[in-house]
Amino acid sequence: MINTRKTHPLDKIVNNMFIDLPAPSNISSWWNFGSLLGICLILQILTGLFLAMHYTADTTTAFSSVTHICRDVNYGWIIRYMHANGASMFFICLFMHVGRGLYYGSYTFLETWNIGVILLFATMATAFMGYVLPWGQMSFWGATVITNLLSAIPYIGTNLVEWIWGGFSVDKATLTRFFAFHFILPFIIAALTMVHLLFLHETGSNNPTGISSDADKIPFHPYYTIKDILGALLLILTLMLLVLFSPDLLGDPDNYTPANPLNTPPHIKPEWYFLFAYAILRSIPNKLGGVLALVLSILILILMPMLHTSKQQSMMFRPISQCLFWVLVADLLTLTWIGGQPVEHPYIIIGQLASVMYFLLILVLMPVASTIENNLLKW
């Protein structure tokens, strides 16, 4: 049989992306998360498809349809929990992937980075809408609180919120459209992922040193295919440990109570992966200010290439920047913790300090540290 790997139009695309792709010889396990995100996306689309076969997007039956999936559908419980915890694994990989990009200066690949930020926004939107679908207490009140934030937009805010709701409150129309969007967005994410990869392969991968690796490349297969398979096995192992031993570890008990518009839960909070942004939102007493800070906390990633003042791409040889990077990681963990706490002393002030620190680190301290390191190079 003739080997069509390099001649057939379709095979050629796959070959140039995953087989004969020249890759740097020194990329570490931090470069595994891209492929893991791809696996997470495929897993979410497949489990989501099977859930959609049994789910009903109606306020009267949504909650009981999820219960029906868990109790009556063959292996419905495992599909449901793989989907719910798969989202958590997705975001763990996302945060690691973005963190890798920040640490090693991958944001200098502008198109790849900007599409990555759009992908992050799209994934967050998808996850938020997915959380509304089981129609539990936290689903309903989470949807109410987060969509209500848009009312802070001057002049058009109130009309915009009612337009999104499809009425005067979160109701049947809201649930139906959220289900429709939650179904279509992963396919848009998949398409954007292809564009993300397309732009990445225009420049080639970065590497830990941040120095051009053109002189030292190895083929993607078998070196990185086997490495990606190992990463995938570890991902699936972690996911299945979570699903089979403590499926509700990352969920909220309130979501096992059917949605009730007349009874507000004592602490409304989103899923754990949104808590850092939620803490930033809550730390500003003004509604519009809070919403702006919330959006900017993610949108600030777009500014990273402009804030890069160092003569070196990577942080590998920049100890001051390294310290600040890990302070930023600690700050984000603090914000995540604060986001899950009630609004009372001392959590309020800790949240405000952590929020100020977050923006201060990215906008001021890290660019200043880079400039200092540039001057130290002259010595």
Curated annotation (Swiss-Prot):
Note on cofactor: Binds 2 heme b groups non-covalently.
Membrane spanning residue stretches: 33-53, 77-98, 113-133, 178-198, 226-246, 288-308, 320-340, 347-367
Classification via PROSITE patterns: CYTB_CTER, CYTB_NTER
Subcellular location: Mitochondrion inner membrane
Superkingdom assignment: Eukaryota
CDD domains: cytochrome_b_C, Cytochrome_b_N
Major location (coarse): mitochondrion
UniProt-annotated binding residues for a ubiquinone: H201
Cofactor dependency: heme b
UniProt keyword annotation of Mitochondrion present: yes
Gene Ontology annotations of biological process type: mitochondrial electron transport, ubiquinol to cytochrome c
Topological type in the membrane: Multi-pass membrane protein
Note: Heme 1 (or BL or b562) is low-potential and absorbs at about 562 nm, and heme 2 (or BH or b566) is high-potential and absorbs at about 566 nm.
Subunit structure, as described in the record: The cytochrome bc1 complex contains 11 subunits: 3 respiratory subunits (MT-CYB, CYC1 and UQCRFS1), 2 core proteins (UQCRC1 and UQCRC2) and 6 low-molecular weight proteins (UQCRH/QCR6, UQCRB/QCR7, UQCRQ/QCR8, UQCR10/QCR9, UQCR11/QCR10 and a cleavage product of UQCRFS1). This cytochrome bc1 complex then forms a dimer.
PANTHER family, per the entry: CYTOCHROME B
The name this protein goes by in its record: Cytochrome b
Species assigned in the record: Antilope cervicapra
